[in-house]
């Protein structure tokens, strides 16, 4: 099982954006498999695609993942162009992790509907793939997006639990990403995804990634609780309770997810400190 590092782009009180470049550079040196972001719109997060584009320029090997980006909050043609551009400038290191989103304010602030977000997302995904294939879109007679490095589409991981998500995944995705769950909930989702994958006649097997949080330094613990409770609102207590707070808990988390067939476990930072990445690398024995 690979170990990824989630950048703290949703942490509160980050007053120096260059810290993301420092963490990215060090994470690659330490041997992490990927750098990931999470994101909302109605919250003072650093925007995911911009952070990952900067990280791409500061690195040369490490993978890049949005985990997840709220797809229906974005204009689809622009999102297709942004994702394909990041895929190209990173040399094929980018994976677009997407979810539908469940908080109405993320849609209100963008002027987009909340109740019809699922239907809109279905239409948007089809339009994005047409753009990636180089097809002219309504209003133009020529391609509008760079072609992805694989010639077909930017790799997509889907998050969520709805039945409709499974249909999107087997149509457009390479696998599933779980945010804020447990090894047991991943087992449940793997069974559902695997069944849908086989039913759709897809070849090979879907990829599985999962997100968890950690805070290994005293300075990280001090701000982690406040940041997580603010970001997750009514779910904050549950997320805070699941934070890995020492090396033993990091290793236990790794063993539990590896045992259920997770391909990559992403430990997400709760504080913007290079030292936290170094502590995690030591705890996970990846260096």
Which residues fall in each region the model found?
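Active-site-adjacent structural elements that line small-molecule/cofactor binding pockets in enzymes
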Residues: 1-287
């Amino acid at each position: 099982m690979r170990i990824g590092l989630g950048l703290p782009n949703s942490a509160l009180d980050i007053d120096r954006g260059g810290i993301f470049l420092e963490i990215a550079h060090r994470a690659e040196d330490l041997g992490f498999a990927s750098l990931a972001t999470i994101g909302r719109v109605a919250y003072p997060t650093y925007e995911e695609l911009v952070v990952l584009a900067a990280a791409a320029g500061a690195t040369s090997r490490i993978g890049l993942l949005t985990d997840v980006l709220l797809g229906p909050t974005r204009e689809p043609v622009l999102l297709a162009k942004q994702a394909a551009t990041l895929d190209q400038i990173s040399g094929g290191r980018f994976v677009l992790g997407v979810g539908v989103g469940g908080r109405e304010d993320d849609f209100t602030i963008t002027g987009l509907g909340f109740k019809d977000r699922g239907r809109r997302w279905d239409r948007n995904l089809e339009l994005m793939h047409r753009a990636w294939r180089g097809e002219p879109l309504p209003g133009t007679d020529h391609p509008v997006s760079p072609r992805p490095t694989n010639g077909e589409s930017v790799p997509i991981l889907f998050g969520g639990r709805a039945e409709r998500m499974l249909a999107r995944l087997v149509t457009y995705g390479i696998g599933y990403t779980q945010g804020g769950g447990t090894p047991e909930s991943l087992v449940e989702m793997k069974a559902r995804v695997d069944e849908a994958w086989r039913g759709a006649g897809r070849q090979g097997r879907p990829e599985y990634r999962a997100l968890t949080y950690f805070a290994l330094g005293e300075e990280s613990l001090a701000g982690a609780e406040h940041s997580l409770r603010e970001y997750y609102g009514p779910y904050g207590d549950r997320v805070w309770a699941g934070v890995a707070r020492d090396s033993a808990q990091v290793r236990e988390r790794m063993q539990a997810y590896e045992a259920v067939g997770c391909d990559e476990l992403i430990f997400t930072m709760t504080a913007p400190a290079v030292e936290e990445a170094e502590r995690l690398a030591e705890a996970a024995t990846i260096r």
